[in-house]
Amino acid sequence: MNAPRHYLQFKDFSRAEYDYLFSRTRWIKDRFKRYEPHHPLFDRTLVMIFEKASTRTRLSFEAGMQQLGGSAIYLNTRDSQLGRGEPVEDAAQVISRMSDIVMIRTFEQSIIERFAEYSRVPVINGLTNEYHPCQILADIFTFIEHRGPIQGKTVAWVGDSNNVCNTWLQAAEVLDFQVRVSTPPGYEVEPERAGLIGTGHFAHFDDPMEACRGADLVTTDVWTSMGFEAENEERMRDFADWQVDEDMMKVANPGAVFMHCLPAHRGEEVSAEVIDGPQSVVWDEAENRLHAQKALMEFLMIGKIEGDCA
């Protein structure tokens, strides 16, 4: 039995593999829009394990697997033995014998890595405190749809250096673009935690306006991620000057787009004028989670399919 491929961090795939995935996502999305069935995963089963609650992750994976002809089973740790102390290694061996692919959304990256080590089937990171590769897979596809290749472009990240930020930084190394990060003091990027090879693809800016100047894409996330609720009051004060507003978008490139992984808090990390404005592509970005993850699951379970991609 060959060892399965997993998708735990953005850097798990090469640039060539991402080129394929983006082309495949476009092909799958086009078929979806034409109401043409595509069932390469007929009779396959996805198990989704949630320790962190979600709307978009569950919906996109569950609907996506059904659209590919398979079925999806939802587990949360409160209602399973994982929440009662069963070792992750034991759960991985059992669950992977009863399914064809597993998606996990949890807190610690080490949990998903341990699960993958003992799994007989592919494991996908649906989100951890450290990384959110599926989100950036969809985000970059969305940028390509609207503005073309991301290679050589500039992304401005404004706000907390969280899991989404870490994944943007990994993506910059793999796909050769620049990320400018602006965070309040004390919230800076930790290159080792972000899993970076070097620091040549990102720069830190104390002033968020300068980070956005000339950017092709401006993006942010909530100021208080899940698991950090106890810090909310302090974070509201610390991040007050890091709201993406119309002034920041005005200094970006004229064709710049705005992204947010959602859910968003208007009036906190982004103004209503920006997220609901003409440069915002957040709804395409959210929909593309569905199509990008279909391409991802197909790739992990079947491999490259020649001839169908444009």
Where are these regions (language model features)?
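Adenosine-phosphate binding glycine-rich loop
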Residues: G255-A256, C261-A310
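Glycine-rich phosphate/diphosphate-binding loop of Rossmann-like nucleotide-binding domains
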Residues: E51-A63, E145-T220
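Anion-binding alpha/beta catalytic cores of soluble intermediary-metabolism enzymes, centered on
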Residues: A92-I95, D100-A171, H260
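Active-site-proximal loop->helix
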Residues: I73-I95, Y118, Q170-A171, E188-G200
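Active-site cofactor/substrate anionic-group-binding motifs, chiefly glycine-
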Residues: T45-L46, F50-M98
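Positively charged, low-complexity intrinsically disordered leader regions
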Residues: M1-L59, A63, Y131
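Rossmann-like adenosine-cofactor binding region
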Residues: I197-A272
